[in-house]
């Protein structure tokens, strides 16, 4: 506490106002002390340039165009903007007494009135409900705003006392009704509660932030977990976690697959390697120098506690090493581990994931031993033996996880029709995709014997209001023989315009013999029509 007040400098008077305000309320005083004690290191970015980028991001939501931001001079101007060049406003130097008091009062209000408050302790309340910020977002008086908006909604959806079911009902409602626009085009700090209350645009971070604001405003103990890299999808990812009444933790992300449910024992199926939790309290851990003091290693909550002694190369010196995972763009550091007597002490890792011990010199990561993986409680090393090469037929590069299955399920119900009239005033159904594709290359064998010149692909109707069912095709080819390897000549002659009016996703990309280009329609259920040049009997698609 003394350190925090010293760091406040001239702003110390504001923080002491809060402490004096609660001098006769021991519990709220301790809550204030918790926030002030852990305030050093927290801060946010507030700048007119951030508002300019947000204006571009708003447009995607206002135009309801889905996962792309509309092209504009504004968009091109800010595409390379990096917020980290801006000055950061330390909370300890700018926090007002009024803001902190309002945050504490509103937090205690919901804690005292909600039926699930009895499920968690005061310490849990301080870490899981009380914090006024998540990351580096601009500060808003968000608690009452979110409470007033979502408390009536929760009451209309659920009136019981089961905390898990209450979260499940509200999260599933968001899944069905919230329009979320995915974009990774801008490097921005956390967007903030007020912005996200109107515009859900960004990445998984913005969905988890929105959920934290909603559920904490209603008294639910909610936090955010993340991994830095997953071999399942080659990215980082974050999701929400609910602290259960039995002390356990329930992970969820409400924009996950269409059959998403908040329930005990659930998992998204992604490999995680190492898992970290976002915290308001600072932690003096071995990874603080890597990720900052506001992350806590919680891998053991997902995979149990474990420890393994892993061999390192003989030339490795020092008393510590880095633990990493391989990615196509280089190694991703996920932990720091001690070295003792020529071995690394690696603890709390996910079995079945390949890791790599690393050294770091001038910012360059280099292997410090063979890759390894834990299998059945033992360390398995991957040491190459070129005398035992084998040939493998690989159908997928990555496992078919639930979220990928959800993407591919949007093809279910799509129809392919044929006609000799380019405007399809009469047509015959050639094929209907009745099941979710399992991979990106699929063959279908029509039973029609008549020749037709024109083919039309139509995506399925949306399963729920915010579902994205636009045409998205990398390649659609037609064959006059089931044994033929050479497809019939075809040309996309008309269809819905490409998303964002981007020529890179125009209709010609659906039949250009390049699997890495694709047609992506701007509107829902936009069809695309192909001309086979003359009437043909289609035996294979």
Placement of each model-derived feature along the sequence:
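Hydrophobic/aromatic-rich core segments of domains that either
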Residues: 2-9, 21, 152, 156-173, ...
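A short, amphipathic beta-strand motif
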Residues: 305-314
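Aromatic, loop-rich ligand-recognition surfaces of beta-strand-rich domains
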Residues: 388-429, 435-540
């Amino acid at each position: 506490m003394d350190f925090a007040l010293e760091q406040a400098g001239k702003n110390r008077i504001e923080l002491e106002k809060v402490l004096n305000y609660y001098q006769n309320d021991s519990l709220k005083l301790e809550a204030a002390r918790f926030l002030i004690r852990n305030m050093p290191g927290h801060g946010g970015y507030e700048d007119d340039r951030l508002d300019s980028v947000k204006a571009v991001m708003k447009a995607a939501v206002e135009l309801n165009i889905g996962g792309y931001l509309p092209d504009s001079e504004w968009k091109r101007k800010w595409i390379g903007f990096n917020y980290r060049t801006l000055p950061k406003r330390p909370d300890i130097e700018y926090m007002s007494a009024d803001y902190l008091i309002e945050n504490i009062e509103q937090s205690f209000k919901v804690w005292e009135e909600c039926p699930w408050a009895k499920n968690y302790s005061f310490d849990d309340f301080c870490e899981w409900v009380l914090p006024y910020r998540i990351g580096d977002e601009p500060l808003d008086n968000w608690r009452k705003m979110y409470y007033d908006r979502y408390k009536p909604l929760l009451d209309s959806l659920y009136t019981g006392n089961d905390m898990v079911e209450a979260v499940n009902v509200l999260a599933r409602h968001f899944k069905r009704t919230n329009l979320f626009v995915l974009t990774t085009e801008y490097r921005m700090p956390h967007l903030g509660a007020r912005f996200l209350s109107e515009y859900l645009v960004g990445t998984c971070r913005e969905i988890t932030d929105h959920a934290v604001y909603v559920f904490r405003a209603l008294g639910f103990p909610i936090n955010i977990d993340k991994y830095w890299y997953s071999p399942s999808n080659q990215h980082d990812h974050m999701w929400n976690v609910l602290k259960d009444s039995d002390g356990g933790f329930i992970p969820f992300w409400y924009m996950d697959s269409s059959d998403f449910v908040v329930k005990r024992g659930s998992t998204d199926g992604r490999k995680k390697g190492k898992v970290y939790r976002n915290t308001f309290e600072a932690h003096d851990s071995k990874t603080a120098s890597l990720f900052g003091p506001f992350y806590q290693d919680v891998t053991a909550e997902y995979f149990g506690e474990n420890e393994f002694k892993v061999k390192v190369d003989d030339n490795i010196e020092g008393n510590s090493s880095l633990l990493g995972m391989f990615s196509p763009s280089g190694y991703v550091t996920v932990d720091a581990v001690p070295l003792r007597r020529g071995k690394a002490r690696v603890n709390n890792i996910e079995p079945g994931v390949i890791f790599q011990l690393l050294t770091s010199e001038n910012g360059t990561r280099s292997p410090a031993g063979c890759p390894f993986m834990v299998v059945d409680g033992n360390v398995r090393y991957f040491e190459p033996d070129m005398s035992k090469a084998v040939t493998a037929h690989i159908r997928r590069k990555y496992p078919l996880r639930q979220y990928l299955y959800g993407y591919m399920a949007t093809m279910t119900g799509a129809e392919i029709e044929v006609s000799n009239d380019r405007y399809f005033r009469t047509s015959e159904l050639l094929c209907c995709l009745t099941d979710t594709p399992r991979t990106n290359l699929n063959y279908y064998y029509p039973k029609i014997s008549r020749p037709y010149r024109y083919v039309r692909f139509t995506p399925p109707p949306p399963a729920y209001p915010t579902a994205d069912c636009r045409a998205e095709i990398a390649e659609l080819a037609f064959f006059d023989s089931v044994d033929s390897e050479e497809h019939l000549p075809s040309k996309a002659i008309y269809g819905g315009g490409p998303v964002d009016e981007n020529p890179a996703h125009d209709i010609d990309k659906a039949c250009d013999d390049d699997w890495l280009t694709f047609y992506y329609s701007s509107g829902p259920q936009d069809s695309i029509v192909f001309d086979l040049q003359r009437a043909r009997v289609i035996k294979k698609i």
